[in-house]
């Protein structure tokens, strides 16, 4: 199965010794057999479901652990990275000393030494000029399966001379007993060294740490080259018109970009360069809680052989109870992108975007289902990144809580948010793109805006009917709202209509406006940021 001549000897360069066997770039059938091996115990063992997909559990780590993320502070990163301990604004880029890095690296390499290992060589980025060649090393078959699904799978020819730009060593079974003395958050760690170009994982089994780890790396490298790096999904119409959907986990990026009328470019991570929009990934990582064939047919039918389910409840007959959130609200499935029929082929990239959609899940019930943004409002709401953290996507979050996440992805930003905003705005201006704010969250009824209405809103954005619609201005937020749209309940377009009285909306709106204003203060120490204050609520 080995295409190139990778040997256990090669792994000694990473500090991994006495490897029993290398399973190099296994095919899906091999992984299927490995995951169902009855000799496996605990979280290593997969369960076969009636669709042919394998289901695995990730233990207490059913979401990312942002408090356990660290980056080595050295000459490479000292003056470029957006550090957690410098300046204004909250982020997860906690500095790590070289000494502690060496200790953590020793723990992981010791864990992987003397073992039977799975190696996956894959690409991150569909543009051959800027993609990263990544080597993933793990002792767990399903973790190899996960990255095979999620990253771009090289051809046999591309594997012949594959040279990794970045190494990910997943030591999920090891923890750091010296964390207290080292001033770390816990015994678990997700650590990066951008000089050595290595990511280490210890203690957490959550597959998303590998996916989002590489996203953080791309978020460091690309904007420094003038390329937009975006936490968004993207699709393209028959006429070549590209739409991108920004939003945090659970706001609808995957669901809304998976549209039978349009071809999917990707569901979560993209770049935007001189040629257009391109996917970082080769797969999708969709939430499955309360999944149904009726509401989300493409995702539902993508769950078949080679898909990998996480933390779902499998019944005795092999069927999956997608409504069961007893393990987590953040149940997931990863699958190769070709499990979706309507995708861009052969490479997941297209032209420049004409529609930029910011998805927010407003827990206050204040924002309208859709509004058309001015250029300054686009920058303001991109930097604000308002949404609600939805249950389960991070450990310890069980109820929707309002949050501000710069660029709709602060957890993954490696540079200061204004750098991403500047690059995005330049790309949008060059392409003549228009931005919209879409609330997929709640309104005054206390219920979530229906996916039917949201899909009709997206259709109106894509086909241009929203741009042609008459609008009125929502007070306090100064947002332009259409008076009516095809297929959308007109009553809900003005959020004030969903309350018992206008005063009830006003009260909540004032509270939310105050949060926006307080959050944006961290950007007002620059002339560019101060100039955007008037684009927000007042």
Curated annotation (Swiss-Prot):
Cofactor binding note of this UniProt entry: Binds 1 Mn(2+) ion per subunit.
Pathway named in the protein's UniProt entry: Carbohydrate biosynthesis; gluconeogenesis
GO-annotated molecular function: ATP binding; metal ion binding; phosphoenolpyruvate carboxykinase (ATP) activity
Binding site for ATP: 212, 231, 247-255, 296, 332, 448-449, 454
Keyword Protease: no
Sequence positions that bind Mn(2+): 212, 231, 268
Cofactor requirements of the protein: Mn(2+)
Pfam families: PEPCK_ATP
Gene3D superfamilies on file: 3.90.228.20, Phosphoenolpyruvate Carboxykinase, domain 1, Phosphoenolpyruvate Carboxykinase, domain 2
Binding locations of substrate: 64, 206, 212, 332
Coiled-coil regions listed in the entry: none
Catalytic activity: oxaloacetate + ATP = phosphoenolpyruvate + ADP + CO2
EC number: 4.1.1.49
Domain of life of the native organism: Bacteria
Entry's Gene Ontology BP terms: gluconeogenesis
Keywords recorded for this protein, A-Z: ATP-binding, Cytoplasm, Decarboxylase, Gluconeogenesis, Lyase, Manganese, Metal-binding, Nucleotide-binding
Cellular component terms (Gene Ontology): cytosol
Localization, UniProt: Cytoplasm
Similarity-based family: Belongs to the phosphoenolpyruvate carboxykinase (ATP) family.
Subunit text: Monomer.
HAMAP family xref list: PEPCK_ATP (MF_00453)
Function: Involved in the gluconeogenesis. Catalyzes the conversion of oxaloacetate (OAA) to phosphoenolpyruvate (PEP) through direct phosphoryl transfer between the nucleoside triphosphate and OAA.
Protein name, per record: Phosphoenolpyruvate carboxykinase (ATP)
Organism classification: Bacteria, Pseudomonadati, Pseudomonadota, Gammaproteobacteria, Enterobacterales
């Amino acid at each position: 199965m080995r295409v190139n001549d990778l040997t256990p000897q090669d792994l000694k360069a990473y500090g991994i010794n006495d490897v029993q066997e290398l399973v190099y770039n296994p095919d899906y059938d091999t992984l299927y057999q490995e995951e169902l091996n009855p000799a496996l115990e605990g979280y290593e063992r997969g369960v076969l479901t009636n669709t042919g997909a394998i289901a695995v559990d990730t233990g207490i780590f059913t979401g990312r652990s942002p408090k356990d993320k660290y980056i080595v502070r050295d000459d490479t990163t000292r003056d470029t990275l957006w550090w957690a301990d410098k300046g204004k604004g909250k982020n997860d880029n906690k500095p790590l000393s070289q000494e502690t890095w060496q200790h953590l690296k020793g723990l992981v390499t010791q864990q992987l030494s003397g073992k039977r290992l799975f190696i996956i060589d894959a690409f991150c980025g569909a543009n051959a000029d800027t993609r990263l060649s990544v080597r993933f090393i793990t002792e767990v078959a399903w973790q190899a399966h996960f990255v095979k699904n999620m990253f771009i799978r090289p051809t046999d020819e591309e594997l012949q001379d594959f040279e990794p730009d970045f190494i990910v060593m997943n030591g999920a079974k090891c923890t750091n007993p010296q964390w207290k003395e080292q001033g770390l958050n816990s015994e678990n760690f997700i650590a990066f060294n951008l000089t050595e170009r290595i990511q280490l994982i210890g203690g957490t089994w959550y597959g998303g740490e590998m996916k989002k780890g590489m996203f953080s790396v791309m978020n460091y490298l690309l904007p420094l080259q003038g390329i937009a790096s975006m936490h968004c999904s993207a699709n393209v119409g028959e006429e070549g018109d590209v739409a991108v959907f920004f939003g945090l986990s659970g706001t609808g990026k995957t669901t809304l970009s998976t549209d039978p009328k349009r071809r999917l470019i990707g569901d979560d991570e993209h770049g935007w360069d001189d040629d257009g929009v391109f996917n970082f990934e080769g797969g999708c990582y969709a939430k499955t809680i309360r999944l149904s064939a009726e509401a989300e047919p493409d995702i539902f039918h993508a769950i078949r052989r080679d898909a990998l389910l996480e933390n779902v409840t499998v019944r005795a007959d092999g069927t999956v109870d997608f409504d069961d959130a007893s393990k987590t609200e953040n149940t997931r499935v990863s699958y190769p992108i070709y499990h979706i029929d309507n995708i861009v082929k052969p490479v997941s990239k297209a032209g420049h975007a004409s529609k930029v959609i910011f998805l927010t899940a407003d827990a206050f019930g204040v924002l309208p289902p859709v509004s058309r943004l001015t250029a300054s409002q686009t920058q303001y709401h991109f930097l604000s990144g308002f949404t609600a953290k939805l249950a389960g996507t991070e450990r310890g979050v069980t109820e929707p809580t309002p949050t501000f996440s710069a660029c709709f992805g602060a957890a993954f930003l490696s540079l200061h948010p204004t750098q991403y905003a500047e690059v995005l705005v330049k790309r949008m201006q060059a392409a003549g793109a228009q931005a919209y704010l879409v609330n997929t969250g709640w309104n005054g009824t206390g219920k979530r805006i229906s996916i039917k209405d949201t899909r009709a809103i997206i259709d109106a954005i894509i086909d241009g009917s929203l741009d042609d619609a008459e609008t009125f201005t929502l007070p306090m937020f100064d947002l332009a709202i259409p008076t009516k749209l095809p297929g959308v309940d007109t009553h809900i377009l003005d959020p004030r209509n969903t309350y018992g009285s206008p005063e009830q909306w006003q009260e909540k709106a004032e509270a939310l406006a105050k949060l926006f204003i307080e959050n944006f203060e961290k950007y007002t120490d620059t002339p560019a940021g101060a100039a955007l204050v008037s684009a927000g609520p007042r």
